[in-house]
Amino acid sequence: MAVQTDIEIARAARKKPIQEIGAGLGIPAEALIPYGHDKAKVGQGFIRGLEGRPDGKLILVTAINPTPAGEGKTTTTVGLGDGLNRIGKKAVICIREASLGPNFGMKGGAAGGGRAQVVPMEDMNLHFTGDFHAITAAHNLLAAMIDNHIYWGNALELDARRITWRRVMDMNDRALRDTVVNLGGVANGFPRQTGFDITVASEVMAILCLADDLEDLERRLGRIVVGYRRDKSPVYCRDLKAAGAMAVLLKDAMQPNLVQTIENNPAFVHGGPFANIAHGCNSVIATRTALKLADYVVTEAGFGADLGAEKFFDIKCRLAGLKPSAAVVVATVRALKMNGGVAREDLGREDVAALRRGCANLGRHIANVKGFGVPVVVAINHFTTDTEAEIEAVRAYAAGQGAEAFLCRHWAEGSAGIEDLAQKVVELAEAPSMFAPLYPDDMPLFEKMETVARRIYHAHDVIADHVIRDQLRTWEEAGYGALPVCMAKTQYSFTTDAAIRGAPEGHSIPIREVRLAAGAGFVVAICGEIRTMPGLPSQPAAELIHLDEEGRIEGLF
């Protein structure tokens, strides 16, 4: 019998009406704004009424450094949420929305996989409720208003050479990284160099994911720095009178999306910043809403713990006042073997020696998460090529690092395959949280970057020229010194070289550029060759995506 694909499993799911899913959480039908029969937004009025309720336990799912195909972190997040519900706990899943870029590129969708999926999978991986389109429109409205302001006289005296606000689109398109706009003569404006980022790297995306409510959203939008005058003083979005119109475009997108898993458990899917080039977490408003409605909230942060978990702790939890109770580090035998030097085409063969070498990567992530005061458990996401000897080697290594490891078969078996992990997570979460961020607010910005590089990446030093250091000092003098930092670097390594696997020591982290996200509330350090507009691979997934003769989508994964 052929193994069903993710899309076939999702299509066969017996979904409940979304009002029934909401009712299970105590959300009345009138508080839901339906988008069809199987997804809805939760109204701001209902969310405001939750204030004062006690919070449930917050569980983070993170991972080791991934292989290019991903290691099933979202699948494990969904599976664990289902598993907690299976053992009698009231649990909600909180994950990010999918970007079209990786859907049509290499990584694929963001709805989980196998028997641990959020549905409707096809909608989620494509346009969903239109949030990303609204974010793109709001971002590009500001870009249009900048060029329009300059065209009509430039009363704010913006220096066209120092405009920092680029345009965005939700697609991988390297051809748009660097562009020249306003060509074609004086009727079109004044030519200048700029470029595009992917929507998930937009500061508007980060603002939507970190804002408390609509009032806070508009206030943060107004704080966006769009560029500088010749005297290097900043020009803000509010100076252009753009924040109100942007907030109008984002009004509906600000409301969390409620959907369900294949097992009919509730899931909030809202926001979608990448963790390699942004802060990598779903929205604060969705997480807080879930914490008021459930005893356990299972959320994920993008890529490995060096990126997603660090930003979850140091940016999201710091800014939102959240206290995680436990963390799950997802590992796969194949990724550990790759970290141990095995070529991608050989990952299906047993190689315990390489696996043990690669386990150093797992050990680094376990230690890093523990460094935030959060108890850790390891989930071994099972693949059919795993051997018993390899699985036991991972268990033994994790035990040596003070973390129990559980083999999880949620992809194939759903919640029945992850019960043991769910029980352990409940046990860990019952202890008082000792969570603390990595660095204090009052540490200088460059020292914060050095702290992340040395403590999390085990780098020897951080390389930044005097222009970058001077810029950071200028921002500190302007009152931005207390902001956390967001390190943008490759997800495949603790270094800035994607080819260096394992747990390297003593390397350097070069900072190529720094960007102030004053509205979101952090400073971005772009490290190595990472790009905020990805490109497509030589054989993009888009080549395999099509409609069949009945108009059904094929090829999504």
UniProtKB/Swiss-Prot annotation:
InterPro entries reported in the protein's UniProt record? Formate_THF_ligase, Formate_THF_ligase_CS, P-loop_NTPase
Q: Which molecular-function annotations from GO does this UniProt entry contain?
A: ATP binding; formate-tetrahydrofolate ligase activity
GO BP: any one term = tetrahydrofolate interconversion
Q: In which pathway does it act?
A: One-carbon metabolism; tetrahydrofolate interconversion
Can you tell which superkingdom this protein's organism belongs to?
Bacteria
Query: Reaction(s) catalyzed by this protein?
Result: (6S)-5,6,7,8-tetrahydrofolate + formate + ATP = (6R)-10-formyltetrahydrofolate + ADP + phosphate
- Classification via CDD domains: FTHFS
Q: Which Gene3D superfamilies match?
A: Domain 2, N(10)-formyltetrahydrofolate synthetase, Formyltetrahydrofolate synthetase, domain 3, P-loop containing nucleotide triphosphate hydrolases
Q: Which UniProt keywords are given for this protein, alphabetically ordered?
A: ATP-binding, Ligase, Nucleotide-binding, One-carbon metabolism
UniProt binding sites for ATP: T67, P68, A69, G70, E71, G72, K73, T74
EC assignment: the record states 6.3.4.3
| Protein family membership | Belongs to the formate--tetrahydrofolate ligase family.
This chain belongs to the protein called: Formate--tetrahydrofolate ligase
The gene name on file is fhs
